[in-house]
């Protein structure tokens, strides 16, 4: 309580009156005391990190050379402090000597005929390069030895030094022939419901317009004979996928659909998969290798639709996560098992299949 009473004495003081009563020297002292400087601020120069602690006038400009001379003279005049323990120069420990590597016994056992050893011992660099060129051992020569030997006239076999080593001859692989399918003619045959046309292959035909691909999807709605339809690498996009999804809801004949290596996004793929419950004839669907990844959310929705489908036997897509991959594999395995049981039922009698969980 006494401390609070002491503080109340200074609550009603007039600061302007107190400052007006101070002298010029007292104001200068107060200014120095209130000068806020940070000594730990590394961004400020050393002279600005603290207050000016002297009022003396400078004796002259700063000269670095004179300061260094003064410090050197002062260091020579004052004797160094003696060591508490004098240095005796005694060496302790053992001198490190590297171990000699053992010689290769194979190299030690190599012996040549006396005449050959004498010839190699007295051979010049040009003669050694000549031997290396004849034997084809170009790694025995350094670059300096190579150019010196090449410039000398005493070397015999200069062709061996400059000889070109022939690479391995590979069999030329011809480019894949372009797809011979006539786009317009095939479209007309689908519209006319040609019974001889059961497979449509438009793979790698990159100049097919998007309206033409959508016209194919519209024509397949009424076609009764086409069982395989493939448009791999045709630059198909989401509008084509939406048209194919509408076709799957109506078509009851198509068994294989391949739309790999295109520009279909996750929305187009989901639309295709969501059309599977309305289709009972499709047994194989391939959607892998699109221009952009589908994402975890789209993969989970695809798996949920696959688990509800009982007719699809092959699904061509590489899932990025292990969970959806295993669930899709189990769904395809169960569908193939149902086909096997139906086939056995036709031969031996009715077999009641096990109910799939979550369906």
Curated annotation (Swiss-Prot):
Source organism superkingdom: Eukaryota
Region (Tropomyosin-binding), start-end ranges = 39-138
Keyword Cytoplasm recorded:
yes
Q: Which gene encodes it?
A: Tmod1
Q: Which GO terms describe its molecular function?
A: actin binding; tropomyosin binding
The subcellular localization recorded is: Cytoplasm, Cytoskeleton
Q: Its Gene Ontology biological processes?
A: actin filament organization; adult locomotory behavior; lens fiber cell development; muscle contraction; myofibril assembly; pointed-end actin filament capping
Q: Which organism is it from?
A: Rattus norvegicus (Rat)
Q: Under which name does UniProt file this protein?
A: Tropomodulin-1
Recorded hits in Pfam families, A to Z, give:
Tropomodulin
Q: Does the keyword Cytoplasm apply?
A: yes
